[in-house]
UniProtKB/Swiss-Prot annotation:
GO terms for cellular component: cytoplasm. The lineage of its organism: Bacteria, Pseudomonadati, Pseudomonadota, Gammaproteobacteria, Enterobacterales. Pfam families: NAD_kinase, NAD_kinase_C. This is NAD kinase. The active site is at 73 (proton acceptor). One of its GO terms (biological process) is NAD metabolic process. Its EC number is 2.7.1.23. InterPro entries: ATP-NAD_kinase_N, ATP-NAD_kinase_PpnK-typ_C, NAD/diacylglycerol_kinase_sf, NADK. It is found in: Cytoplasm.
């Protein structure tokens, strides 16, 4: 088998025996096939391997050309938040529930992975979002998001008054529990649950979805991914926060605003050649079967 990848990182958070077996089987299979393998520290401790090459996520990003993430979409998102800063490709073996991103089936994972490792794969460059909390155009706090940036309050079901500017032009004002700003990758997640549209992964688009708006006319808004979004708040607003992929939370203080824009970094996600985005949607969302 011709090696299109030479150094492979194994990433995951095994929480049950079947996941541990998948990690160990993958590790032994890669070693047997002559690959240099780095395995994340926490995974190596769980597997109790004999003198493996261990590494942090950052080291895997620096030294490996492919990372195999074993787990659900949450595990892949967590790993990708670090690995997206490096020139490394990522593929996922699903050990979670949905598996929109981690799409390899554990039962056929090694067969499909063998095809990928021989160069028979497709590459998707999924763009990220930069979220910046600013005070007079000076960045106070920032983070990235692969799925979505969510404006919300510290307390549940508290209304927020805010204004949305797109490319320095006033777009709309809103009284709502919050706002979801989603990438195409995130459009099948939290955004979809809030009534947002599904955006094909290849589109250069961002969707803004109000959360429980205090009006009947509020609708999701789809804009070009090159647009810069600014959220402004009245001075009476308190306890405001933005959440990036439900993993990083940034506090918004009095007098601060939020800028959200397309990041210069990408999630380099790869799939077997047989991967079909719309077939995945049909399967995961239980859409109707073909009539003929």
């Amino acid at each position: 088998m011709k090696q299109h990848f030479t150094c492979i990182g194994i990433v995951g958070r095994p929480r049950h025996d079947s996941a541990l077996i998948t990690h160990k089987t993958l590790y032994e299979w890669l070693i047997k096939n002559g690959y240099k393998v780095f395995i994340e520290h926490t995974v190596a401790r769980e597997l109790k391997l004999n003198n493996p090459n261990t590494a942090t996520l950052i080291e895997i990003g620096e030294f490996c050309d492919l990372a195999v993430v074993i787990g659900g979409d949450g595990n892949l998102l967590c790993a990708a938040r670090v690995l997206s800063f490096y020139n490394i490709k990522i593929i996922g073996i699903n050990r979670g529930n949905l598996g929109f991103l981690a799409d390899l089936n554990p039962d056929t994972g090694l067969k499909k992975l063998s095809e990928v490792l021989s160069g028979n794969y497709s590459l998707e460059n999924r763009f990220l979002l930069d979220a910046q909390v600013c005070q007079k155009k000076i960045i106070s706090r920032s983070s990235i998001a692969i799925n979505e940036v969510v404006l919300h309050t510290k307390n549940l079901a508290h209304m927020i008054e805010f204004e949305v500017y797109i490319d320095n032009k006033f777009s709309f004002s809103q009284r709502a529990d919050g706002l979801i700003v989603s990438t195409p990758t995130g459009s099948t997640g939290y955004s979809l649950s809030a009534g947002g549209p599904i955006i094909a992964a290849s589109l250069d688009a961002i969707v803004l979805v109000p959360m429980f708006p205090h009006t009947l006319s509020a609708r999701p808004l789809v804009i070009h991914s090159d647009s810069i979004i600014c959220l402004k708040f009245s001075n009476i607003q308190t306890n405001l926060k933005i959440s990036c992929d439900s993993q990083i939370i940034l506090t918004i203080k009095k007098g601060e605003c939020v800028f959200i824009r397309r990041s210069c970094y990408y999630l380099n996600l790869i799939h077997p050649k047989s991967y079909n985005y719309f077939k995945t949607l049909t399967s995961k969302l239980s859409w109707s079967k073909k009539f003929f």
